[in-house]
Amino acid sequence: MNSDIPDPSDWIDSKLSGLKDVDETLRCHICKEFFTAPMITGCGHTFCSLCIQRYLTNTSQRCPTCMQEQQISQLRKNVTVETLVEHFSAQRATILRVVKEAAKQPIPEVVEPPSSPDLDDGRRRSGRKRTRTNYTETLVSSDDIQVECPVCQAMLPGAAINRHLDNNCNDTGANGGNWLGTKKKTKPLRKIQRVNQASESVANVRRKLQDEGLSTSGSKQTLFRRYDEWVTLWNANVDNKTPRSKSDIKDDLRRWETTVVANENAQPVKMTIKNIDDRQWVQKHKEDYDYLIEQARKSILKKKQEKEKEQQQQQEGHQKAVDRREDNEPDMKRSETEGYQVVS
């Protein structure tokens, strides 16, 4: 097991080998890392926000898993998966360490000491007493829990939430300042709309780049690609539970331009799916492939039947025309013969 480079294979030789599947499920199908700002597609598959936006923008407008057509506008935040990843990744190293240490320790033999009725009664009474004590401590400590105000999003002790709401969120703590630990949430970041290269002018894109504090140099293609990548990076950052600063996103854009846009004629960056075993892929998606193959066969058979039916109808129509012509020929011959009769 290697906790320095987290990988699902870390669990294979442990007593918790079943966590390998959990570990794999909480990873993005594109980058193979734990989900960052996970987004769910219209077809129900989840990817990192940045990964899926780059993939749909630069590679294909189809889901990398099931190949159904997808649009960026269909993406939605997957809050449940984000929470699962947060908790699992936070405890992953600890669980691995505990499992590894437990595997090295011999299992001690449990020897039951002789018991007496008085001793058992004492244990039961002591257990009940400890239970009551712990319950009391839990009740007392629950008032100290920090909760979020549903109106102003301030954090304050649970016992003070009602008074805080009664005062229209204008009350203060004992020291005259805000409640201990109170911190109002900053204004939520907003996503940026993408531009259509076919209808958007270069001057307008250059103005948008300038408004964002970005470079406005380069050709038309460079400007559009720069702004498109900025929108991808920024919107993915907005999806993140803990967004980074704008300067950090600008640094990401500069690194992208340095490594990807080597010149004006550089091809769009391609998102590739790495480290995939062909046999595992086929086995994992066998049902999907079987379904697609069956649908393709039905489609081919249907087209073939329609073509045969059309040909048969054409042949029948041609045969009817021939039959009608043959039926009319004797009458025509008879009329011609009668027309040449000599009247005496």
From Swiss-Prot:
UniProtKB keywords: DNA damage, DNA repair, DNA-binding, Metal-binding, Nucleus, Transferase, Ubl conjugation pathway, Zinc, Zinc-finger
Localization: Nucleus
Metabolic or biological pathway: Protein modification; protein ubiquitination
Ranges of residues in domain SAP: 197-231
Residues covered by region (Disordered): 107-132, 302-344
SMART domains referenced in this protein's UniProt entry, alphabetically: RING, ZnF_Rad18
Classification via Gene3D superfamilies: Classic Zinc Finger (3.30.160.60), Zinc/RING finger domain, C3HC4 (zinc finger) (3.30.40.10)
An example Gene Ontology CC term for this record: nucleus
SUPFAM superfamilies: RING/U-box (SSF57850)
Record-listed E.C. numbers: 2.3.2.27
Biological process (GO), any one: postreplication repair
Zinc finger extent (RING-type): 28-67
Biased composition (Basic and acidic residues): 303-337
Complexes and interactors: Interacts with E2 UBC2, forming a complex with ubiquitin ligase activity.
Entry protein name: Postreplication repair E3 ubiquitin-protein ligase RAD18
Species annotation: Yarrowia lipolytica (strain CLIB 122 / E 150)
Lineage start: Eukaryota, Fungi, Dikarya, Ascomycota, Saccharomycotina
